Amino acid sequence: MKKIEHIGIAVKNLQTSNLLFASLFGKEPYKTEIVESEGVSTSFFQVGPNKIELLQGIAKENPISKFIDKKGEGIHHIAFEVDNIYHE
């Protein structure tokens, strides 16, 4: 493993969470996108060398809404940067 690429946080309301995190970090997200294949909307914040991804489920059936229904809002995943995903 080279480093943590980003930490993904599942949220119920991306717009509200963007406002909260922008207030905490003193900056707006540098990227927002809809990932149709997963049924989610995301925002990314750069915090020093680290990235935080906020994810909200937008489709009827999606992994983020299922996660929140079971566990509530919070850390959903940690993504690592590697040289070779099949070797690590």
Locations of regions flagged by a protein language model:
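Core segments of cupin and vicinal oxygen chelate
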Residues: M1-K2, I9-K51, E88
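Vicinal oxygen chelate
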Residues: V11-L19, A59, K70-E88
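A short, acidic/glycine-rich surface segment
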Residues: Y30-K31, E61-K66
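Short, charge-rich binding segments
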Residues: F44, I68-K71
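Short, low-complexity, polar/charged sequence segments that are solvent-exposed and flexible
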Residues: P49-K51, I64, K71-I75
